[in-house]
Amino acid sequence: MIGRLNHVAIAVPDLEAAAAQYRNTLGAEVGAPQDEPDHGVTVIFITLPNTKIELLHPLGEGSPIAGFLEKNPAGGIHHICYEVEDILAARDRLKEAGARVLGSGEPKIGAHGKPVLFLHPKDFNGCLVELEQV
């Protein structure tokens, strides 16, 4: 069911500074900022040879990233994202196995324009997991 690692998401207090660090210090290919109002974030994707890094910064009132940064002012790893071929089948199988899907349980369109779901971190060793349909 689980596919390749799509990205590791890192919440950052200063999006421009974080992007510059990846671009200038590490020599990475850094994309342009994208506002994702449905998710309350602005994101920048960093392309690596084998996966991506997603930099997350709060967007708007009630952003879940704002709460994360309040607890972790320097930022930190927010979630990991795995690819799945059929997000509804994956959701149903995970729920049957006892995993909790966050929100309404229905996929939303993510930053790549594909359906995504999030799984409760308490069900995955403290790690928030995102599933993205490929």
UniProtKB/Swiss-Prot annotation:
Active-site positions on this chain: 130
InterPro entries: Glyas_Bleomycin-R_OHBP_Dase, MeMalonyl-CoA_epimerase, MMCE/EMCE_epimerase, VOC
SUPFAM superfamilies: Glyoxalase/Bleomycin resistance protein/Dihydroxybiphenyl dioxygenase (SSF54593)
Superkingdom of origin: Bacteria
Required cofactor names: Co(2+); Mn(2+)
Keywords assigned: Cobalt, Isomerase, Manganese, Metal-binding
Cofactor note: Can use Co(2+) or Mn(2+) as cofactor, but Mg(2+) and Ni(2+) cannot support enzymatic activity.
Any Pfam family the entry gives: Glyoxalase_4
Domain VOC, residue spans: 4-134
EC number: 5.1.99.-, 5.1.99.1
GO MF annotation terms: metal ion binding; methylmalonyl-CoA epimerase activity
Disulfide bonds: none
Gene Ontology biological-process annotations: L-methylmalonyl-CoA metabolic process
CDD domains: MMCE
PANTHER family: METHYLMALONYL-COA EPIMERASE (PTHR43048), METHYLMALONYL-COA EPIMERASE, MITOCHONDRIAL (PTHR43048:SF3)
Function: Promiscuous isomerase that catalyzes epimerization of both ethylmalonyl-CoA and methylmalonyl-CoA. Has thus a dual role in the ethylmalonyl-CoA pathway for acetyl-CoA assimilation required for R.sphaeroides growth on acetate as sole carbon source.
Similarity comment: family membership: Belongs to the methylmalonyl-CoA epimerase family.
Name of the featured protein: Ethylmalonyl-CoA/methylmalonyl-CoA epimerase
Naturally occurring in which organism (per UniProt): Cereibacter sphaeroides (strain ATCC 17023 / DSM 158 / JCM 6121 / CCUG 31486 / LMG 2827 / NBRC 12203 / NCIMB 8253 / ATH 2.4.1.)
Gene: epi
